[in-house]
A protein has these predicted regions:
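Tandem CBS (Cystathionine beta-synthase) repeat/Bateman regulatory domains
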Residues: 1-87
Length: 87
């Protein structure tokens, strides 16, 4: 039973670490992203300093692409389901 609990805690800590990353840590740079399929209806804008746990459901449940902006409002990158899966 203790082995199961230890393995569960390791997994939980990885999930917690991931959720506490900031948007800028997992985004694709703006110049490397294909913007051809983006519309206003399938995007969600966040600041680069926002933690992933605050918008992860928007990506997974609503299938939105997150537009990451800096403090001046300039787009610096994008986050899709692929970035969540690969990190």
């Amino acid at each position: 039973m203790n082995i199961f609990k230890a393995i569960f805690n390791i997994f939980l800590s990885k999930e917690t670490k991931f959720n506490n990353l900031e948007a800028r840590n997992i985004m694709i740079d703006e110049s490397n992203f294909n913007k051809m399929n983006l519309t206003l209806g399938n995007t969600f804008k966040v600041n680069e300093n926002i933690k992933i746990k605050n918008f992860k459901e928007k990506i997974t449940e609503d299938n939105l692409t997150v537009v990451v902006t800096n403090n001046k409002g300039k787009t610096i990158g994008y986050i899709t389901k692929n970035e969540l899966i690969n990190n």
